[in-house]
Design a protein with these regions (language model features):
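An amphipathic alpha-helical core segment
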Residues: 179-211, 215
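Short, contiguous alpha-helical
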Residues: 39-80, 132-193, 226
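Internal, conserved structured core segments that host functional sites
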Residues: 97-154
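Amphipathic, well-ordered alpha-helical segments in soluble domains
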Residues: 22-25, 29, 59, 112-115, ...
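An N-terminal domain-cap segment
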Residues: 2-54
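Surface-exposed helix-capping loop/turn segments at secondary-structure junctions
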Residues: 32-38, 122-128, 166
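Short, helix-capping/interhelical loops that line the mouth of catalytic, cofactor-
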Residues: 1-14, 62-117, 121-122
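C-terminal interaction segments
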Residues: 213-246
Length: 246
């Protein structure tokens, strides 16, 4: 049993490895899909698998250089209008990659994987900059760009890999070292956000048993379903109603 205090923050060397490995895992999953599977609808209502992959590619390539990142957010801001900038950014990513064949999309994602992992974790000054993010409940949080680069972008690709597996019925390739580390980091943030005692047993290769305080609720669920619930993909009640950004 692990207390949440024992779950250390993801270090920059870890972040680089997790980012590169997660993109490679997405490439492996997408590269094995049939034409029919590319057209399946996902848990993101506006996207089929093909559109979701276009977003992921846009995010991967968009964080391989400062000029590219700035241009992406400027274009996304224009598309968003009065709405959240991130919605415009994701729409821009899908639009810019919709002309690619699925083979081209996968090849470009594979080529950019190590570059984006390196660039995201070498931004010593940029990582300190604040970034305002609108949450699903309408509140606005201030994050650091380091949190975006080293945590959120990897979580985003990871959750979309889960989305693709859900849409296609494919079995996720999960390991304790990679997926378990991502899930543990989610557990630690979830615990900080709700601040209440609990014992949580997460089953599956990415799972573990976590605790905080005493006398709290006891929860048991699949590790992937836990994260899907916290990401808003599935309904949650009690402590599982506390969402975590992905």
């Amino acid at each position: 049993m692990i207390t949440t205090a024992e779950i250390g923050p993801i270090t920059r060397p870890e972040a680089r490895e997790l980012a590169e490995d997660e993109t490679a895992a997405m490439v492996a999953l997408l590269g094995d899909l049939s034409p029919e599977e590319w057209a399946r609808r996902t848990d993101c209502p506006a996207w089929d698998v093909r559109a979701m992959a276009g977003h992921v590619l846009g995010m991967v390539e968009g964080f391989t250089g400062l000029r590219r990142m700035v241009a992406m957010f400027r274009a996304g801001g224009k598309l968003a209008g009065d709405g959240p900038t991130i919605d415009g950014v994701t729409a821009y990513q899908v639009m810019m990659n919709e002309h690619l064949t699925t083979g081209e999309l996968v090849a470009r994602m594979a080529a950019a994987a190590p570059r984006q992992a390196r660039w995201r974790t070498e931004r010593t000054l940029l990582r300190r900059m604040p970034s305002k993010e609108e949450m699903p409940d309408g509140t606005v949080e201030t994050w650091t760009m380091g949190y975006v680069f080293e945590v959120i972008l990897t979580r985003d690709t990871w959750m979309h890999r889960v989305d693709v597996a859900q849409a296609t019925g494919r079995t996720l390739d999960l390991t304790p070292a990679h997926d378990g580390r991502i899930v543990a980091d989610v557990v630690a943030e979830w615990a900080r956000r709700h601040g209440r005692p609990f014992t949580l047993e997460l089953t599956g290769p990415a799972g573990g048993t976590y605790t905080e305080g005493s006398g709290g609720v006891e929860l048991t669920c699949d590790a992937i379903e836990f994260c899907r619930t916290l990401a808003g993909r599935a309904p949650g009640s009690g402590l599982l109603a506390q969402q975590v950004p992905f």
